[in-house]
Amino acid sequence: MKFTIMSKGDQSSDALASTMKEYLLDFGFIMDEQEPDIVISVGGDGTLLYAFHRYYNRLDETAFVGVHTGHLGFYADWLPTEVEKLVIAIAKTPFQVVEYPLLEVIIRYVNGSKESQYLAMNEATVKSAEGTLVTEVEIRGEYFETFRGDGLCISTPSGSTAYNKALGGAIIHPSIEAIQIAEMASINNRVFRTVGSPLVLPKHHTCVLKPTAGMNLQITVDHLTMVHQDVKSIQYRVANEKVRFVRFRPFPFWKRVRDSFVADK
């Protein structure tokens, strides 16, 4: 089996990554940064996001597992003290794979140039680079509303605990194939009106934003931030692709939610 390890880059993460590499090589595994079967992330959830975007083009062949060198995260269930146990599990145990839905983002341009396409594991956001975002919102090909405000956040179920939650969005279990649209400081008065509530769209339902002509947009996809000009539309939907996580033991989603937001530290 082929593996690679991506480290956060700090001293403790690099040391753990080096130790795991030596152990796995001793077990006869092959280090392969180009076409790994397993990607081991050592750091935090941000490190695993980087790993996902590094290997987004081979999601059917690659599975991810995370070791947290900080506090326990939503994408990693292994602690630094459990590294030897994890290595033995990888080497000796047939692993199960859990699949999480992803968000597909397609940006189309006024001048007809080639569209830009992205996958998000957590969320994608859109804001005006200059001020208030003004955009038509279409759902399933029908006009829904004209949004005016700071921006919009479109999240996956696994990303619903991140920026989406801070915006008042619902937490959605990753077994549900859906995306969620949450508003950022919408303008609502007697003249301008939005639904003012997060929207949950099931698979096969598409949301298309059509921003005001000439507006420069700041668009994020997970940790990536870009400025796009001459945008005709931005399309969001549940992606056909899924991210796969290696599981050697139960890792209940609602326990993670409780430990992160409710339980005493």
UniProtKB/Swiss-Prot annotation:
NADP as UniProt keyword: yes
Binding site for NAD(+): D45, G46, N122, E123, R148, D150, A185
Cofactor(s) listed: a divalent metal cation
Primary subcellular site in the record, as a coarse category: cytoplasm
Enzyme type, top EC level: transferase
Keywords: ATP-binding, Cytoplasm, Kinase, NAD, NADP, Nucleotide-binding, Transferase
Reactions mediated catalytically: NAD(+) + ATP = ADP + NADP(+) + H(+)
E.C. designation(s): 2.7.1.23
Compartment(s) of residence: Cytoplasm
Annotated Gene Ontology cellular component terms: cytoplasm
InterPro entries noted in UniProt: ATP-NAD_kinase_N (IPR017438), ATP-NAD_kinase_PpnK-typ_C (IPR017437), NAD/diacylglycerol_kinase_sf (IPR016064), NADK (IPR002504)
UniProt-annotated catalytic positions: D45 (proton acceptor)
Domain of life assignment: Bacteria
SUPFAM superfamilies: NAD kinase/diacylglycerol kinase-like
One of the GO biological process terms: NADP biosynthetic process
GO MF, one annotated term: metal ion binding
Family listed: Belongs to the NAD kinase family.
Stated role: Involved in the regulation of the intracellular balance of NAD and NADP, and is a key enzyme in the biosynthesis of NADP. Catalyzes specifically the phosphorylation on 2'-hydroxyl of the adenosine moiety of NAD to yield NADP.
Record's protein name: NAD kinase 1
Organism: Bacillus cereus (strain ATCC 10987 / NRS 248)
